[in-house]
């Protein structure tokens, strides 16, 4: 687990930022008329995905450590996972700021790229677990 320590620490550091995002959303909603209903929807989606995926990352590192992957492959898998988390949740925030109702935007594209990165990272983990001695 020592080899993955930096990734674990980064996830734990990122978690309070997601918590602060929830506080920020609540403050904006309570002020009223700051965000449109469209913006609130996409802010919530980005916030929820960031929180859930960050918690998933902590499990991911635990299981990745049980594989027989080399340290380089483990770090590559972690980097792919983190990039996927940032793109998946960040795309929702970008869509909130730049998108329009019922239309795709650059945020939508980034969210899809994030989902693909997450699938790649999870597929690597599954492969590593299946082939572990």
Each language-model region and where it sits:
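Polytopic transmembrane helical bundles with strong interfacial aromatic enrichment
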Residues: 1-133
């Amino acid at each position: 687990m020592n080899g993955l320590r930096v990734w674990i620490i980064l996830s734990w550091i990122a978690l309070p930022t997601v918590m602060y995002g929830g506080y920020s959303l609540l403050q904006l909603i309570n002020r009223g008329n700051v965000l449109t209903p469209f913006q609130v929807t996409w802010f919530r989606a980005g916030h929820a995905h960031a929180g859930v995926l960050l918690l998933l990352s902590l499990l991911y590192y635990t299981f990745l450590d049980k594989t027989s992957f080399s340290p380089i492959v483990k770090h590559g898998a972690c980097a792919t996972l983190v990039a996927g988390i940032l793109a998946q949740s960040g795309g929702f925030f970008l869509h909130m700021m730049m998108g329009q109702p019922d239309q795709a935007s650059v945020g939508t594209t980034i969210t899809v790229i994030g989902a693909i990165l997450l699938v790649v990272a999870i597929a690597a983990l599954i492969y590593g677990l299946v082939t572990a001695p």
